[in-house]
Each structure stands twice: as C-alpha cells, then as structure tokens.
C-alpha cells in the first residue's frame, strides 16, 4: 500500500522529535536552574540556616520550567498516529512546538539558576535584595511561559 505524498512514512518521526525536544531541553534547563540555585542555597545556609526555606523559591521556579515541557510533550505524544493518518505538516508543526518550549525552557532555566544563585547569596548579606531577586526570577520564568504559549498555539494548528 502506497502512502500519499503528504503522509510519508517518516512523518511521525518529526512529531516524536518534537515531543522529545520539549521534555529534554526544558528538563535540562530546569536541572541547571535547580543545581545552580541549589548550590547557592547550600553555600548561604552555612552562615544563615534560618533563610533556607525562604531561599527555596528559585528551585521551585526552575522545576516549573520542566512542567511546561512535560505538558507539550504529552500533548504531542497523545496526537501521534500511524503514518497513514499523520501528515508531514503535522509532524513539522509538532517539531516546532517542541523546540519552542524546549529551548525557551532551557534559556529560562539558565537565567533562573544564575539569578537564583546570586540572589540567595546576596539576600543572606542584605535582606532587602529579596524582593528584587523575586522580580528578576519572575521575568526569567516568563521566558519559559512564552515558549509554552507559542508551543500550544502551534500545536492547535
């Protein structure tokens, strides 16, 4: 049985790559953000152990980045189908959605990690820096949210 030109046998491959890219790159960003800000918390908590729970916010925000990638990966994986029912166009759209959320999650995770590390160390020395750190972390988190919005918009095409 010959497949139509718009539904080649390799069409679903691009959808699978989109799902993989979504979770892999966003999880890499979340892992980096968690590790980088976690080391800052560990270094700060030696001198100021009472600030540990207050300083956990960057770690939580980094973990949310991975959830963005997970949502898109599950959406894409749920719509995968046999090559006869899955067009090349849909595969490319899903690849683009996965790359959008994945790379924006990677960038957001890097930003959260660097800001979180410096922020918790600075907050230990000057508590008034806490509000500024939170605001910068929110701006870094929104970078990942932009990727999620674009990915969901692409997915619905």
Curated annotation (Swiss-Prot):
Q: How does the entry describe its membrane topology?
A: Multi-pass membrane protein
The record ties this protein, via InterPro entries, to: ATPase_proteolipid_c-like_dom (IPR002379), ATPase_proteolipid_csu (IPR000245), ATPase_proteolipid_su_C_euk (IPR011555), F/V-ATP_Csub_sf (IPR035921)
Q: Keywords, A to Z?
A: Hydrogen ion transport, Ion transport, Membrane, Transmembrane, Transmembrane helix, Transport
Q: Which residues lie on this side of the membrane: Lumenal?
A: 1-10, 77-94, 155-157
Record's Gene Ontology CC terms? Answer: proton-transporting V-type ATPase, V0 domain
Name the residues that span the membrane.
11-33, 56-76, 95-116, 129-154
Tell me which parts of the chain lie in the Cytoplasmic compartment: 34-55, 117-128
Keyword Transmembrane set for record: yes
User: In which broad location class does this protein mainly occur, judging by the first location in its UniProt entry?
Assistant: membrane
Question: Would the keyword Transmembrane helix be found if you checked this record's keyword annotation?
Answer: yes
Essential for proton translocation (site feature) positions: 141
Which CDD domains is this protein grouped with? ATP-synt_Vo_c_ATP6C_rpt1, ATP-synt_Vo_c_ATP6C_rpt2
**Localization of this protein:** Membrane
- Please list the GO terms describing molecular function: proton-transporting ATPase activity, rotational mechanism
What is this protein's function? Proton-conducting pore forming subunit of the V0 complex of vacuolar(H+)-ATPase (V-ATPase), a multisubunit enzyme composed of a peripheral complex (V1) that hydrolyzes ATP and a membrane integral complex (V0) that translocates protons. V-ATPase is responsible for acidifying and maintaining the pH of intracellular compartments and in some cell types, is targeted to the plasma membrane, where it is responsible for acidifying the extracellular environment.
Q: Which family does it belong to?
A: Belongs to the V-ATPase proteolipid subunit family.
Subunit structure, per the record?
V-ATPase is a heteromultimeric enzyme made up of two complexes: the ATP-hydrolytic V1 complex and the proton translocation V0 complex. The V1 complex consists of three catalytic AB heterodimers that form a heterohexamer, three peripheral stalks each consisting of EG heterodimers, one central rotor including subunits D and F, and the regulatory subunits C and H. The proton translocation complex V0 consists of the proton transport subunit a, a ring of proteolipid subunits c9c'', rotary subunit d, subunits e and f, and the accessory subunits VhaAC45 and ATP6AP2.
What NCBIfam families does the entry give? V_ATP_synt_C (TIGR01100)
Q: State the protein's name.
A: V-type proton ATPase 16 kDa proteolipid subunit c
Native organism is Aedes aegypti
């Amino acid at each position: 049985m010959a497949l139509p030109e718009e539904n080649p046998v390799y069409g679903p491959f691009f959808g699978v790559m989109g799902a993989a890219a979504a979770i892999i790159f966003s999880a890499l960003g979340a892992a980096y953000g968690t590790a980088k800000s976690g080391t800052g918390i560990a270094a700060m908590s030696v001198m100021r152990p009472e600030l540990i729970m207050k300083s956990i916010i960057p770690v939580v925000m980094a973990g949310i980045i991975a959830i963005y990638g997970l949502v898109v990966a599950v959406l894409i994986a749920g719509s995968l189908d046999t090559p006869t029912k899955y067009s090349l166009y849909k595969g490319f759209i899903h690849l683009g959605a996965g790359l959008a959320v994945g790379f924006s999650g990677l960038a957001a995770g890097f930003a959260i990690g660097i800001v979180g590390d410096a922020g918790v160390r600075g907050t230990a020395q000057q508590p008034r820096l806490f509000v500024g750190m939170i605001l910068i972390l929110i701006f870094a988190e929104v970078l990942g949210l932009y990727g999620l919005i674009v990915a969901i918009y692409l997915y619905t095409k």
